[in-house]
Amino acid sequence: MPEYSPIPNNISVLLSMLALMCSTVSAQELVPRAYWPTPNGTNILVLGYQKTTGDIVTDPSLPLTGVDSDIDYLQLSYQRTFSLAGRTATMQLSLPYSRGYTEGLLEGEIRGRHTSGLGDARVRLSYNIKGAPSMDAKGFQALRADPKTIVGVSLLVQAPTGDYEVDKVINVGTNRWSIKPAIGVIWPMRPTWLLEFEVGAWFFGDNGDFLGETREQDPILSTEIHLVKRIRPGFWASLDANFYMGGRTSVGDSEQANLQRSSRFGATVVLPFKGRHAFRGSLSTGLVTKTGGDFEMLSLSYLYAW
């Protein structure tokens, strides 16, 4: 049986998964440090806020054009690290709430709606298959001092728990199941520099109650790359970029001309304080946009770890 060592007060041991717990916008998200491990038995609670403005809706594949939105998100997340077959594994639960106004064109007609309510809940399981055996705080400090190449896999499941009205185009929830399997690699370039890469794919269930018809969506291939600078224990910053393609939808027998092919660029900073607390901030913008994705995002989060 693995030994569960007490978690030390040093926040550097507890912050490495913060960025993972703060994003709410499916394939368009930027998530640095998604596969960096924490010691066995670590718990993290995060309260996150996001502000998005521009061509964005809760479900980016909706058949809307000329979208202009102003949406605020709150998200509560809990995460625990544990040992699975002698390797580091992490389970994360997230529940978002959003409120905002969205306006766009649907078949040449302007549609606008104020929305508020709970979004779709998420569960994510990640597992490190190389470079991150289950470890106590002492082992984690050794990994920080001499980083190794880390390879991890993950599965994210998004459940149709959000508020959804069958007679509305614009909703908070998506009324369908979604899953995203992914694989990620962390390469240490120097002791304080890390290069991270992830490739994954979103797969979507059907929405059988889309204005009286069934709405289907093709998978979306997504990639992310992050350059991370560790400034001091627990204090780090990153430059983030992604690219995603696919996701064409069909409603009934009609295929939509809404293939997504876009990329985003942003930056993230995490600053610890008073031992077990931290703040996180990030900004991102559309770099190349086709069929949505041209929006600005500000994210602020508070973290408590034990």
Which residues make up each language-model segment?
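Residues that define the transmembrane beta-barrel architecture of outer-membrane proteins
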Residues: 41, 68-74, 116-123, 149, ...
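Repeated loop/turn-to-beta-strand initiation elements of outer-membrane beta-barrel proteins
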Residues: 55-56, 86-89, 133, 192-195, ...
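Residues on the lipid-exposed face of transmembrane beta-strands in outer-membrane beta-barrel proteins
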Residues: 47-49, 76-80, 123-129, 155, ...
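Transmembrane beta-strands of outer-membrane beta-barrel proteins
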Residues: 43-45, 89-93, 123, 138, ...
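Outer membrane beta-barrel transmembrane domains
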Residues: 210-306
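Outer-membrane pore/translocation modules
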Residues: 99-216
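Transmembrane beta-strands of outer-membrane beta-barrel pores
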Residues: 49-55, 80, 95-101, 129, ...
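Surface-exposed strand-loop-strand hairpins of Gram-negative outer-membrane beta-barrel proteins
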Residues: 52-73, 110-111, 166-171
